[in-house]
């Protein structure tokens, strides 16, 4: 009995000693493997970095195909499939001057373009030569403040072609426009066809500078042969039979200003908020410069309206053209 009492007392004193020891100093925690692998707390200055295994080494044959950029290399051997092209529009301009003034302006600090077609393009091996001033991957400063459909700032998504041409001169007898040379149009057709094929540019996205900046720009003017360009496989143009049918319809019942306002917007033009004939005039003139160059006064007549709706029918469907008249 006495031995048992001594054992209990000794055990109690030992427990008390351990408890007192625990009060006077924090116990040493044993960190589990899972806790040791946790990421460091936010706010620590030193990030957690790991040391991976041995890096793959390129065989000499593969290594020679790598691109060197400064103090590292790039492997182009794996390609992503989910992407789209920067280029969605082709915009045509004239320079409003001669070769020398065009080159000065387009190689200066304020404006630029991807391609320049000279007044008399040089030839090599029987074929015309165009000047490429900027890589197509780069953003040229050629469209300025611009819009087509829901796209703004078309420098971001377009390739620009400048054609050397004097533009126009105002005279006491009216505005005098200067024509283009046949060899210029031959070269523009070949160049534009190459661009739209490589980037799969929609015909309705081959535009005049005046189309994307109505009222501010008029180039390439009424002498640019858009129909000829279309026949070369580039850009939009209405079918003559469709135009004739719409002319007959509008002779019986012409569209009102609201319907024309909606149709111009549906085609892609940036239109004013209110369907007002005066406010629409610069937009109508831009359309006429492209699709009805024999009459560019900005007034909507039967022929202009017929060409607009014929274009919508051809490229957006007859249902869409009729819907614009019902709304």
Model-flagged regions — what are they?
Residues 164-166, 211, 272:
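Short strand-loop junctions, especially beta-strand C-caps/beta-turns
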Residues 1-12:
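Bacterial N-terminal signal peptides that target proteins for export
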Residues 30-40, 45-202:
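Active-site-adjacent loop/helix surface patches within enzyme catalytic domains
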Residues 201-216:
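Acidic/histidine-rich, metal-coordinating catalytic segments
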